[in-house]
Amino acid sequence: MAAALIPLPVRSRSAAGALRALLAGLVVACAAPGGAQQQAPGIPVAKPWDAVLVASFNIQVFGESKMAKPQVVDVLARVVRNFDIVAIQEVRAKSDDIVPSFVRAVNADGSRYNYVIGPREGRTSSKEQYAFIYDTNRIEADRASVGVVPDPQGRLHRPPMHARFRTRIVPVEMAFTFWLVDIHTDPDEVPQELDALTGVFQAMQAARPDEDDVILLGDLNAGPPEFSAFRRIPGITWAVSGVTTNTRRTKTYDNLVFTQPATREYLGRSGVLDLQAAFGLPLEHALEVSDHNPVWGAFYPAEVRQQALPPMAGQMPVQR
C-alpha cells in the first residue's frame, strides 16, 4: 500500500506548492546558466515547507586565509543559507574560531544557524575537521550522538564524523530523524576507503534499533561507476549521478549515499549548486571559493514508513 502524504503544519498545501512554483527555474545542478533571483539584504532565504534540504560541501582548505577574503565568505554564507543542513569537509585551520566565525557570517542576515564540529583528524601533520552547519529553525541536533566512527585498523585517513538530527517543521512525534555520516576520502586510497565505508555504513545502520535512516555524504573522490563496494549493501542508492561536482566541471566526487526503502523520505530531487552559474562567477573566482560545488538532496520532513513518496515537482532554491 502506498504511503499517504502526512499533512504538514503550513498555512496551506497550496502555499507550499506556490513556493515551489516560484522557485522553479532557478539555477540548480548543471543546468545551463540562468538568472537566479536576488535575495533582498537582511532577509533569510525562504525554504520549502514540504522538504528539508541536506547538502554536502568540501570547502577547500577552509581556514584563516579563506576567512580573510570577505567576498569568498559572502558566497559561502549564501550557499549555506540555501540549505537546512550542510555537511562540511576540509576545515583546515590552527584556530578553533573558523567555523564559529563563519556561522556568525551566515547569521548576519537574521538566519539562525548553529554547528557541530569534530576533532582534527589525519595521519599527517595536515589535519582536517568535519562540521555540520544547520538551520535551528528547521533542524535539531542530538549533541549526545556526535562522534567519530572508530577505525581501529586505520583503514581511513580521516574517519568519518557522525551525528543524528531531527526535523523541527512538523510535530515532534512525526519528525524525520536521521544519521548523517560526513566523510572526505583520501584520493590516493579511494578503493580501500570505499570498501571500509561499506562497513561504516552498515555499522551505523545497526547503531540504534530505532533509527534506520543513515545518509553518508561528503567528498568521496569517486563517482557512481566506482561504487562497486557500496553495491554490497542491500538497497543502496545515491542522490547525484550523471553530473559533475567539481568546480571545473570535469569530475564527480561528491554525493549523498543512503538505502531505500529505509530512507523513504528521499523525494527524488537532488542536484549540484554550480558556483559559477549560481553566483555569476568566472572560473578563477569560483575556485577561490572551493574546487568543489555543493551537492544536495531533498527529503520529506516527516517519517514515512511505507512505500516511497512520489518525486516532488519543481526545483530547489538557489540564492545569488
PLM feature segments, named:
Residues 12-14, 21, 194:
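Hydrophobic alpha-helical segments, especially transmembrane helices
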Residues 3, 7, 24-25, 49:
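Low-complexity, intrinsically disordered short peptide segments enriched in small/polar/basic residues
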Residues 1-15:
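N-terminal secretory signal peptides that target proteins for export/translocation
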Residues 10, 14, 31-32, 299:
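N-terminal regions of proteins, emphasizing targeting and processing segments when present
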Residues 3-5, 29, 290:
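Generic N-terminal simple sequence motifs
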Residues 18-31:
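Bacterial N-terminal signal peptides
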Residues 34-320:
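Divalent cation-coordinating acidic motifs and surrounding scaffolds
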Residues 2-6, 20, 246:
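N-terminal leader/presequence segments that precede the conserved core
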